[in-house]
């Protein structure tokens, strides 16, 4: 008899009679002559109750002594359950203990806090909550590739090791060999963005995207920062800012619709954890157009509301040219508009060197997308297409022009226009799961002062 997945039994348990299952014990209790195991095989969020009885189950005593976390193989019969919270259970006829878990297995049948679970990141996905989050991570990764494939984008595997800093912020991890000094002949670092390489390929395919890990050496240990995270970075030739914001909105709404349609069990579970507010939030996000305001308008709203004492910020020095703090973004997104919000046309001095200057000579064609409860999840812009202007901006930013000459030179060879954005994958996961810490949305988080596992 072939083994059956728990997922398939839950689809229609009445189609099954005798089954063989292999997986792990979530919990085990007995009252002497009868015992109950909560069983999972990782194929879905659900557990199945296994019932074993003295005289009816082979290896009954072994079943009684099996500890939480152990691997087992069972054969049994699918029967209707008398319990109000389950439709069926498995009456075990044959029980085989494949591997007994040690007594110090840390995930016993009780609630564990997020901070403790981060110390056992190699095991936390066995809990309902983190198992659900990581399954959603997998489903969303598939959805991302699916969206771009449906919209005729070419996936570009941008390099992890690079010699350029796409953001110009200098927050790099440097790479070298222990055995060969100056291995690459120049400074090498882990990528902070795949944007530059995506721009090169967009000039051949028009629509491209990268999706992979990026690295930032930020000396920060907040609930919003990790040193290794994943970015989705599309790049589109002949695209302007208005078209880019349209694409961002369509992309974000597609991802939300995808999980609401294809991950119903996971979303139902997370919705209960949020006191039934998560599904309402997500449905509202996809039911209405995203709001759009200029940076100038955002500053005007903030200044007015501070002056009229409608709001109190820690930083109440509001002026054109400031970098908006998270408290300002949160207020605009959640209190003023109460919906996803684009802010666009930022002052050039607070944005990256590669962004295209607007006709006013002070702002650039850049946008950020803010989501209620999380803040910025997307940053995008039109790219400067003039070679001479871009060289001047690099020089002004104290960048070594020779290190990115290949990138600058793209402007000499038919580079008319391009625009792109970056979506922080973990930030987006925080939004759709209502996780409060980005470290809980990535399997093995890396952050300042922490490199476990």
Swiss-Prot record:
CC terms in the record's Gene Ontology section: cytoplasm
Compartments in which it is found: Cytoplasm
Keywords: Aminoacyl-tRNA synthetase, ATP-binding, Cytoplasm, Ligase, Nucleotide-binding, Protein biosynthesis
CDD domains: AsxRS_core, EcAsnRS_like_N
MF annotations from Gene Ontology: asparagine-tRNA ligase activity; ATP binding; nucleic acid binding
Record-linked Gene3D superfamilies: Bira Bifunctional Protein, Domain 2, Nucleic acid-binding proteins
Catalytic reaction equation(s): tRNA(Asn) + L-asparagine + ATP = L-asparaginyl-tRNA(Asn) + AMP + diphosphate + H(+)
InterPro entries in UniProt: Aa-tRNA-synt_II, aa-tRNA-synth_II, aa-tRNA-synth_II/BPL/LPL, Asn-tRNA-ligase, Asp/Asn-tRNA-synth_IIb, NA-bd_OB-fold, NA-bd_OB_tRNA
Documented EC number(s): 6.1.1.22
A Gene Ontology biological process term: asparaginyl-tRNA aminoacylation
Coiled-coil regions, chain positions: none
Main location: cytoplasm
Subunit structure: Homodimer.
HAMAP family on file: Asn_tRNA_synth
Family: Belongs to the class-II aminoacyl-tRNA synthetase family.
Listed name of the protein: Asparagine--tRNA ligase
